[in-house]
Amino acid sequence: MPTAAPIIGIVRHSINVDGEGVCTLVAFHSCTLKCKYCLNPHSLSGVEKYKKITPEALLERVKVDDLYFQATNGGITFGGGEPMLRAEFIEEFKRICPSNWRISIETALNVEQSFVRRMFNVIDHYYIDIKDINNTIYESYTGKSNQQVIENLKFL
């Protein structure tokens, strides 16, 4: 069983913004990038504003919206930070949540491909923030190369 994961926020009742239908966004702490325009700077290392939650505790918290998820083809969208870093947590959550919930992920894809391969059969829908295809621009925004992103896009 996975340990609890650091979560910086849970936003319920997002409609057609963080996924199809009614969705709940679950944002994880930690990221592989340091984007100059980061939407969630409190998700970065060094900023310890999070609560550790188990997959079971998350399910207890969000299952109140099961009817909304079923009626709208909605579900849970994992974001962050970089949710691919929490593959074990997401796998366990998918295993225990209702099978008709849609599991989506908002990712920059700048992670080792082993994470992407692990999540391939877990995630129903990907929202990929590519930042920029030009590596020079990408590096100036994020502090890292986009080569891993390109390799992961080819895999998907």
Where are these regions (language model features)?
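Conserved AdoMet/S-adenosylmethionine-binding subsite of the radical SAM
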Residues: 63-67, 72-75, 79-156
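N-terminal [4Fe-4S]-dependent radical SAM core
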Residues: 1-50, 64-70
